[in-house]
Swiss-Prot record:
Listed pathway(s): Cell wall biogenesis; peptidoglycan biosynthesis
Motif residue range(s): Meso-diaminopimelate recognition motif: 422-425
Main enzyme class: ligase
Protein name per its UniProtKB record: UDP-N-acetylmuramoyl-L-alanyl-D-glutamate--2,6-diaminopimelate ligase
Database matches in Pfam families: Mur_ligase (PF01225), Mur_ligase_C (PF02875), Mur_ligase_M (PF08245)
Record: residues binding ATP: 123-129
Originating gene: murE
Cellular location(s): Cytoplasm
EC number: 6.3.2.13
Length: 501
């Protein structure tokens, strides 16, 4: 057993020989006879504590994270008490196992990312919409798309709920292998900063990486904007990425240009010029039906109607357009199908009354960062004839620094604000709201209704048919997390219920 893997560089090749094993997993509860169990030291718990469980459930081989980089890849003495010979299970410790896991899973699942076009989208906001637009567009042109991200993982239109935007290194490779098996030839994948910082996508072969924007988020994890930006940039400079598309209207993208000389740039500034290949909007007209967009590009010019609302969605659709053009798609075919692209669930989604009563317009959006809330309210204002109301809260156990910032934005851009619960999780709802309230210049004008359904009901009851209500923060989510329990809750369902009364 000692020095079973004498050279660290042989690890992936060795894993390829394990293909006859049924599966590899990080969860000891999912282990069955003959499986490969990965025991990682995680951020919340140490998977090595469950090695005994995995052995008892029939694991054939266990890779366990070594205590230090200097540890040899060998049977560690701390596991000797498990009587491994009797159980015919090999336990091997591996230095930097978390960093290597993506490559190990890539070998185990026969490099699925090389068998389809893989596009990675990263940024604070816009990842989901851009990914969904890419998948839709590819399908409209006769392809077979899959998506991975916040809404879920699966073939486009058949997504299954995902716990994280970017799953574990094993889950990502498992999903890609399944997509290939199901006939997908294209995958649009949201890539989170957590996923990048934790090496979950390290071995993926990206045909294209897209950067949407960067603003404050996840500082509870990254601690600084600089660290957050560095995690995002890994998709462009540290991984196997063949081409890049950047939102040139974001300052962070400008900072990256010297390091990405071949990047394709997207801008909504008609005066934008660049030596890079580009796509830019030259004219945009907004209406309740969406937006009319004229553009120029290195591939030619065109115009089309988009069903999506908001200036930020003009950026998202142009990022998708630039991405597909970069991959060699035909401009004329893209323009001809652009008007068929549908809005994304929970992204500036219109909610209508079941009856034809005169009721306010309600938009549900996932905006849960200061930048996203600002852009959503600015977009909503374009469609508001009367007053603009905003219903929002902030998630518990997450970056608390953004709470007063979102309050300031809501107060500045909306005519009326109701503060309510988002997903309080294990944090006290009163503490969350108190921190939000610190951002209001005139807190006496702000209504606080902790119960989210009652907050939505109040907004609809007191709004006129000329008014618009933006319900922000949860978007596509059909649950509310209170404590550690997920309760069924849908902003769309609740809004539709009270609009129809």
């Amino acid at each position: 057993m000692k020095r079973l893997l004498p050279f660290l560089t042989d690890l992936e090749a060795w894993v390829e020989q394990l293909i006859p094993l049924k599966q590899m997993t990080l969860d000891s509860r999912q282990v069955t006879e003959g499986d490969l169990f990965i025991a990682l030291k995680g951020h919340q718990c140490d998977g090595r504590q469950f090695i005994q469980n995995a052995i008892e459930q029939g694991a054939a081989i266990i890779l366990a994270e070594a205590e230090s980089d200097q540890d040899e890849i060998e049977l560690d003495s701390q596991f000797a008490r498990y009587n491994l010979d009797r159980r015919a299970c090999k336990v091997i410790t591996v230095p930097r196992l978390a960093e290597r896991l993506s490559a190990i899973a890539d070998s185990f699942y026969a490099s699925p990312s090389a068998k389809l076009k893989l596009i990675g989208i990263t940024g604070t906001n816009g990842k989901t919409t851009t990914a969904q637009l890419l998948a839709q567009w590819h399908n409209l042109l006769g392809g077979h798309s899959a998506v991975m991200g916040t809404i879920g993982n699966g073939l486009y239109g058949q997504e299954q709920e995902a716990i994280n935007t970017t799953g574990s290194a094993i889950e990502v490779q498992q999903n890609l292998a399944r997509f290939v098996e199901q006939g997908a030839d294209f995958c649009a994948m949201e890539v989170s900063s957590h996923g990048l910082a934790q090496y979950r996508v390290e071995a993926l072969q990206y045909d294209l990486a897209i950067f949407t924007n960067l603003s404050r988020d996840h500082l509870d994890y990254h601690h600084s904007i600089a660290a957050y930006e560095a995690a995002k940039f890994r998709l462009f400079n540290a991984l196997q990425t063949k081409a890049q598309v950047l939102n040139a209207d974001d300052q962070v993208a400008q900072n990256w240009l010297s390091m990405l000389p071949n990047a394709v740039l997207v801008s909504c500034d008609p005066n934008f010029t660049s030596e890079h290949q580009f796509v830019k909007a030259t004219k945009v007209n907004f209406s309740l039906q969406g937006a009319y967009i004229e553009f120029e590009s290195s591939w030619g010019n065109g115009q089309f109607h988009s069903q999506l609302s908001g200036a930020f969605n003009v950026t998202n659709i142009l990022l998708a357009l630039a991405g597909l053009l970069t991959l060699g798609y035909d401009l004329a075919k893209l323009v001809a199908t652009a008007s068929q692209l549908r809005s994304v669930t929970g992204r500036m989604q219109k909610v209508s009354a079941i009856t034809d009563k005169n009721r306010p317009l309600v938009l549900v959006d996932y905006a849960h960062t200061p930048d996203a809330l600002q852009k959503a309210l600015q977009a909503a204002r374009l469609h508001t004839k009367g007053k603009l109301f905003c219903v929002f809260g902030c998630g518990g156990d997450r970056d608390c620094g953004k709470r007063p910032l979102m309050a300031t934005i809501a107060e500045e851009l909306a005519d009326g604000v109701i503060v309510t619960n988002d997903n309080p999780r294990t944090e006290d709802q009163h503490k969350i709201v108190a921190e939000i309230m610190q951002g209001f210049a005139k807190p006496d004008n702000i209504l606080v209704i902790y119960d989210r359904e009652q907050a939505i009901q109040h907004a609809i009851k007191h709004a006129s048919s000329a008014d618009l209500i933006l319900i922000a923060g949860k978007g596509h989510e059909n649950y509310q997390i209170i404590g550690t329990i997920k309760h069924h809750f849908s902003d769309q369902e609740i809004a539709s219920k009270y609009l129809s009364q």
